[in-house]
Amino acid sequence: MNLHEYQAKQLFAEFGLPVPEGYACDTPQEAFEAAGRISTAKKVVKCQVHAGGRGKAGGVELHDTKEGVKEFAQKWLGKNLVTYQTDANGQPVTKILVEEASNIANELYLGAVVDRATRKVVFMASTEGGVEIEKVAEETPELIHKAAIDPLVGPQAYQGRELAFKLGLQGDQIKQFVKIFMGLGEMFTQYDLALLEINPLVITGEGNLLCLDGKINIDSNALYRQPKLREMHDPSQEDKREAHAAQWELNYVALDGNVGCMVNGAGLAMGTMDIVNLHGGKPANFLDVGGGATKERVAEAFKIILSDDNVKAVLVNIFGGIVRCDMIAEGIIGAVKEVGVSVPVVVRLEGTNADLGRKVLAESGLDIIAAESLTDAAQKVVAAAEGK
């Protein structure tokens, strides 16, 4: 689960990290009033969406007057912001962050992520703030400095000092950086984070450190024990189909192809997408129905897949390990009848009772195309999607 910038800064402030004075606003009038409470001559206004690239898309502006701030809010609230990280429809803007402008002398990067290679939380710091860390890692990896956190003892002040030295900080800046580092380390563990970034972490004209932006991603598997963070969830930023899938414990990711895929098992689902692509098709989604592929879940999976108007054919690829293929076949038949599927459906069954499952499908009287192998299934569904 992702947080908005204003929510990330609220958490930063909770742990004593320096953030600009700012207010999240729901209406143009609130934005106008918030601008009046900010003492700096210039105010920064930012659209709050779960996507980067807001500045280049016009979603971040600098204004001298309260009226200018209000006009910005009127322009964007209720609209969609399209950036290079969103799809063509963009993300809806339901809040505007109005905050004081900062006097920036230099920009740094500070972030933390769960590193599966070391099985530790790893902090990353760089002098190349304000740009994507992935770009820095690709072009100048030597400019990224790391500190792995021992889970038994947590972040240590000496690690923060080492990073501060490598960033070229001096004097009181080192103490400020260590405080930020320790606060983020505590926050990462306490709130079950998967990733956090301050980009940029700026050095102001007065020589102080300031968290100018914030990005936080929470481990969704831990949300059951994070009631405070659950309340910060913004469903408007999620794909409606993905949200629907989550309610049924289906793993769904929307893509831009025309072949719907329904598979049990994440690895098999990825392999299915690969072979569809290999035979000239384009997957419209990733969908893993998991081990409990009941009639109800299969029906919901069909509904989700077919809610995408781009889908011209559906490939159902099931390996019967724990579940029996004949039961899956009955679920598919029931789901097709209930949903009223109007596009070609190709089904490949393998594993426990696969022959019986294929027989059940053949005797159903429905227009379901049986496939003998994964290659056969991919070829048939690609042809069906092309109307052949």
Swiss-Prot record:
Cofactor(s) annotated in UniProt: Mg(2+)
InterPro entries assigned to the protein according to its UniProt record, in alphabetical order: ATP-grasp, ATP-grasp_succ-CoA_synth-type, ATP_grasp_subdomain_1, Succ-CoA_synthase_bsu_CS, SUCC_ACL_C, Succ_CoA_ligase-like_bsu, Succinyl-CoA_synth-like
Database matches in SUPFAM superfamilies: Glutathione synthetase ATP-binding domain-like, Succinyl-CoA synthetase domains
Binding positions for ATP per the UniProt entry: 46, 53-55, 99, 102, 107
Pathway(s) where this gene product acts: Carbohydrate metabolism; tricarboxylic acid cycle; succinate from succinyl-CoA (ligase route): step 1/1
Cofactor binding description: Binds 1 Mg(2+) ion per subunit.
Reported function: Succinyl-CoA synthetase functions in the citric acid cycle (TCA), coupling the hydrolysis of succinyl-CoA to the synthesis of either ATP or GTP and thus represents the only step of substrate-level phosphorylation in the TCA. The beta subunit provides nucleotide specificity of the enzyme and binds the substrate succinate, while the binding sites for coenzyme A and phosphate are found in the alpha subunit.
UniProt protein name: Succinate--CoA ligase [ADP-forming] subunit beta
Gene name as annotated: sucC
